[in-house]
Regions:
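Active-site helix of classical SDR
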Residues: 120, 157, 165
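Short C-terminal tail/terminal secondary-structure segment
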Residues: 94, 237-260
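Conserved glycine-rich cofactor-binding loop
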Residues: 9, 16-17
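C-terminal helical subdomain
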Residues: 181, 201-232, 236, 243-245
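Alpha-helical segment proximal to the catalytic Tyr-Lys
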Residues: 125, 170-174, 234
Length: 260
C-alpha cells in the first residue's frame, strides 16, 4: 500500500526529539524522504541513518544555516515538498512578565518565531519553482487561550507564528503552496517532562483542563503533521490546526461520576 507521503521530501527542524522525531519516523513510514535539522550532533547522524535520511546541524536562528538546510534538501533529493518548522524552546527563565528578563524574552523569540520566519523565507522559493508545497509551523494551544501559568515570551512567540502563518497561507494559496499552523496541546515530550519535573503543581494545574485526562503522545501529533503535509489536506490552508484533546474548547472537564 502506498503511503500518503510517497515520493515527497520533508525537512523537519527540531527533528531529534519529541514531536520532531516522531514526525520524522511517521514521514518515513508514509513513504517520504527526510532531512532532519537540529543542533544535536550526538544523535542526529544516528537518527538520520536509522531513517535512511540525512542530518544537517542547523542553528535555526542563523539565516545562512537555514538557507543551507533547504539548499541541501533540494540538492540531495531534488525537491522540498514539506517543511515542518518545529524547532522551539521553553526555558525556565521565561515566566511571568514580572519575572522574565529581556534577554530571556529575546532568546525565545529568536528560536520560536524568528526561526519560523527564516525557514519560510528560505523554503518558499523552492516551492514556488515547483508550483506546490506544504509548510507546517509549530505554534501552540497557548496562542489560542490565556494561561495563569505564564511563559510570556513563549506564548507571544506562538501567537506570532499563528499570525504569520495565516498571512502566508492566504498570500501563496493560488501558487499551490499551503501554510498551516500546528497547535498541539500539552505533549508528553522531554521538554514538557523536564518542565513539569521541576514544578509538579504546574503539571497538575494543566492536566485537569484536558477533557481526555492525559497529555498527547508525540506520535499523535505526528499523525496530524503527516496529514497536513499530504495531499489529503489539499484544501486546508491558513488554519490554526488544533490537536489538543479538546482543551481549547473546555470549560468544565468531565469526572468519572458524571457517567454513573
Amino acid at each position: 500500500m502506498t503511503g500518503k507521503l510517497e515520493g515527497k521530501v520533508g525537512v523537519i527542524t527540531g527533528g531529534c526529539s519529541g514531536i520532531g522525531l516522531a514526525t520524522a519516523r511517521k514521514f518515513v513510514a508514509e513513504g517520504a524522504r527526510v532531512v532532519i535539522a537540529d543542533v544535536d550532533e550526538a544523535n542526529g547522524p544516528r537518527i538520520a541513518a536509522e531513517l535512511g535520511g540525512s542530518f544537517l546541524r542547523t542553528d535555526v536562528t542563523n539565516q545562512a544555516e537555514v538557507e543551507a538546510l533547504f539548499a541541501h534538501a533540494k540538492a540531495t533529493y531534488g525537491s522540498v515538498d514539506v517543511a515542518f518548522n518545529n524547532a522551539g524552546i521553553s526555558p525556565p527563565g521565561d515566566d511571568s512578565i514580572l519575572k522574565t528578563g529581556i534577554d530571556a524574552w529575546k532568546t525565545v523569540q529568536q528560536v520560536n518565531l524568528t526561526s519560523v520566519y527564516l525557514c519560510c523565507k528560505a523554503v518558499l522559493p523552492y516551492m514556488l519553482e515547483q508550483g506546490k508545497g506544504s509548510i507546517i509551523n509549530t505554534a501552540s494551544f497557548v496562542a489560542i487561550m490565556g494561561a495563569a501559568t505564564s511563559q510570556i515570551s513563549y506564548t507571544a512567540s506562538k501567537g506570532g507564528v499563528l499570525a504569520m502563518t495565516r498571512e502566508l497561507g492566504v498570500q501563496f494559496a493560488k501558487k499551490g503552496i499551503r501554510v498551516n499552523s500546528l497547535c498541539p496541546g500539552p505533549v508528553n515530550t522531554p521538554l514538557l517532562r523536564e518542565l513539569f519535573a521541576k514544578d509538579p503543581e504546574r503539571a497538575a494545574r494543566r492536566l485537569i483542563h484536558v477533557p481526555m485526562g492525559r497529555f498527547a503522545e508525540p506520535e499523535e501529533i505526528a499523525n496530524a503533521v503527516a496529514f497536513l503535509g499530504s495531499d489529503e489536506s489539499s484544501f486546508i490552508t491558513a488554519t490554526d490546526f488544533l490537536v489538543d484533546g479538546g482543551l481549547s474548547n473546555a470549560y468544565v472537564t468531565p469526572l468519572e461520576s458524571d457517567f454513573d
